[in-house]
């Protein structure tokens, strides 16, 4: 049972995988050990490791009662609790680390720009096509940029306050599990050293707004950054959705989106006076003045899903699926291609239908 012990050691050291699906665990093991393992063996290992952790937490104390022991070892016990998947509400919210952009020479190549995926309400056909494109261009990719609302955070939605979620029974942990699976699937086609960024959108900001309530903050829910293990995955994270941005090349900004007007691309360029790309509105637009351009690149969600029942028919009629590819050259100049998506989730790029 050597393979079983290998999997168990992996799960003991990376307990976040205990909350992930078997496919995500198999991919993590493949990257770590260069070996493939059956889902049945992974399932058995997860069960045994979870039982180990439960047993460790429930061992009887011989010398003093539980309350005295916890007081005597409060910091040690707090850390133990925060590192187990069975006490997610005890996690403290971390602030993202300061982000440093790669040098221009390390950015030269292809950058994938996605946003408004709204996982688990994403367009599955579109996601599959994007992964196929990434597979074909894997060694050209220098940046993978998630521009906000990758996670829908439907369980914290104000649209559903005091009501069932769009999918009855949906929990925040289930949403994070779905996000982790999608991230695993995308990341298998990213080369080592790829620059990965994650911007919060107004949907991830639902967690920030939730935590501003004093009663909620007493038993905090996992943040998107923690629930998706973003920093552990190597993403540079920014969590102030209406303020934050990343700069690609010399001066091309990417952010979630600020303005929601009919001609929002012009509004962004008028106010920011720099070339940029954003999502947020679920629309596709572009506006150019001289050497500056603003691109609203659409979204990657399934707009027919129950999560968008709040939107009126005229509002949905303006929405479009899309994403973008930005080629950075040696001078740091951006050359952006907007990808328009067909109603069935397919799209064309490089003379091929994905």
Give the label of every model feature segment.
Residues 43-139, 246, 352-354:
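Basic, amphipathic N-terminal segments that precede the first structured/catalytic domain
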Residues 98-99, 114, 119-231:
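Core catalytic region of metal-dependent phosphoesterases/phosphodiesterases
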Residues 251-350:
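Conserved beta-sheet core of the metallophosphoesterase superfamily
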Residues 104-107, 135-140, 190-192, 230, ...:
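Flexible, charged surface loops at secondary-structure boundaries
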Residues 18, 27-51:
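Short, basic interhelical loop/turn and adjoining N-cap
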Residues 1-20:
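Short, amphipathic alpha-helical "recognition" segments used to contact nucleic acids or chromatin
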Residues 218-251:
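Metallo-beta-lactamase
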Residues 109-111, 142-145, 252-253, 275-277:
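Structural motif
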